[in-house]
Amino acid sequence: MTLDDIKQAIPHRDPFLWLDEVVSISDTRIVARKHLPADLDLFRGHYPHFPILPGVIQCEAAFQASAVLISRLLPTGTEMAPVVTRLNNVQFRSMVRPNQTIEMEVELTERLQNTFYLKGKVTCEGKVSCRLEFACTATEIAKEG
């Protein structure tokens, strides 16, 4: 999936869209990537002399990958988006630096109606940087304006 396809599937937009492409997708698994350019604004403040990607952004990238996966499982024509309701067993393993690419792999482990239970892993240059388990509930979204 291209960036345009991703934007069709989920409501996230710049400056808070943390996916560039979807490498593979099935009914229960997605792999997506995001390149992190050195001039990314958040690196100016986290941290100015030793920039690293915040762990919460790694989690958000996994959440957004799951949103693309879940969008394929929801009825067509509905205005719904998954909202994170639970976050468990988060582990940060290695740092992510400017000019690197992160890869998010998310697996759907269980579904109960509009609630989805997932496991995620973020890797960078072959090393796991983050592992997490989380749940989302598909919620109706209203468009402003």
Sequence positions of predicted segments:
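Short loop/turn motifs at secondary-structure junctions and domain boundaries
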Residues: 13-14, 112
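A residue-level detector for short acidic-glycine micro-motifs
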Residues: 21-24, 89, 94, 108-110
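HotDog/MaoC-like acyl-thioester-processing domains
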Residues: 27, 97-103, 107-145
